[in-house]
Structures are given as C-alpha cells and as structure tokens.
Amino acid sequence: MVRSKFKDEHPFDKRKAEAERIRQKYQDRIPVICEKAEKSDIPTIDKKKYLVPADLTVGQFVYVIRKRIKLAPEKAIFIFVDDILPPTAALMSSIYDEHKDEDGFLYVLYASENTFGDLEQYAISE
C-alpha cells in the first residue's frame, strides 16, 4: 500500500475527528482524499479533499478528477483504491464501505497508467 501524503501531513486523531464530523454533518456524502500516484507524469490535482455524493459512480468521480487536472480527452487516467482498480459502474458508497480507512476517509490514487496491474494479460492477440 502506498503511503498517503495527506496521512503524513495530518495526525490520525485529527483525520478521524474530521471524517466523523463530516459524516455527521453530511450523511449522504463520502469524505475522499484524492492524490496523484508518486511516479505518474499526470498533472497534480489542485485539492485533495472531496465530499462526494454517495450515489456517484466511480466513472463520474474519474470525470471530476479529469476536469480538475484539465486532462486532455485522449489521455488515460486510472484510479486506485487499496491498490485495486475499482469498477467504473460501482457506487462510491460501495467503494467507501469496502475500503474506507480506519480514520474514516476513502483514499484514492490516480495515475496516467495502470501502475498496479499488468494490462498485457488483457491484450487481444490477432
């Protein structure tokens, strides 16, 4: 698991208290920390913390990230939660329930390539 810069910069107790406060105040939203994967050549996002509607899909969240980093349409982007590529159609609430951190935030990494898996296994040979 890749270490989050947000975790390094903020003590556990403060992160946990903030996530609890957010969840109490906005029960239909999910607290997400979105960070760029370290060795990715993709632009850095301008803000890390997001309050995401529970019924937003992973694909819709990827669209939000693309817009925030002003990524060209022809450029690929992948997001990872706990080093896995979540299904595009999955609801963020499901991903949160399965992968939220002990501090109450969902940590998402984004990259310009699939850095955690080998896409070659899915290649179609002619």
UniProtKB/Swiss-Prot annotation:
Q: Which Pfam families match?
A: ATG8
One of this protein's GO BP terms?
A: autophagosome maturation
Record-annotated disulphide pairs? none
Q: Tell me the compartments it is located in.
A: Cytoplasmic vesicle, Autophagosome membrane; Vacuole membrane
Q: Where is this region: Disordered?
A: 1-20
Q: An example Gene Ontology cellular component term from the record? A: autophagosome membrane
Establish whether keyword Calcium is in the entry: no
Q: Report membrane topology.
A: Lipid-anchor
A molecular function (GO) held by this record is:
phosphatidylethanolamine binding
Residue ranges the record assigns to the propeptide: 118-126
The site annotation (Cleavage) covers G117, D118
Q: Where is the lipid attached (Phosphatidylethanolamine amidated glycine)?
A: G117
Output the superkingdom of the source species: Eukaryota
**Which InterPro entries would you find in this protein's record?**
Atg8-like, Ubiquitin-like_domsf
The UniProt record lists the keyword Membrane: yes
Ordered alphabetically, the record's keywords are: Autophagy, Cytoplasmic vesicle, Lipoprotein, Membrane, Protein transport, Transport, Ubl conjugation pathway, Vacuole
The known PTMs are summarized as: The C-terminal 9 residues are removed to expose Gly-117 at the C-terminus. The C-terminal Gly is then amidated with phosphatidylethanolamine by an activating system similar to that for ubiquitin.
Q: Which family does it belong to?
A: Belongs to the ATG8 family.
Its function, per the record, reads: Ubiquitin-like modifier involved in autophagosome formation. With ATG4, mediates the delivery of the autophagosomes to the vacuole via the microtubule cytoskeleton. Required for selective autophagic degradation of the nucleus (nucleophagy) as well as for mitophagy which contributes to regulate mitochondrial quantity and quality by eliminating the mitochondria to a basal level to fulfill cellular energy requirements and preventing excess ROS production. Participates also in membrane fusion events that take place in the early secretory pathway.
Q: What name is this protein filed under?
A: Autophagy-related protein 8
What lineage, starting at the top, does this entry show? Answer: Eukaryota, Fungi, Dikarya, Basidiomycota, Agaricomycotina
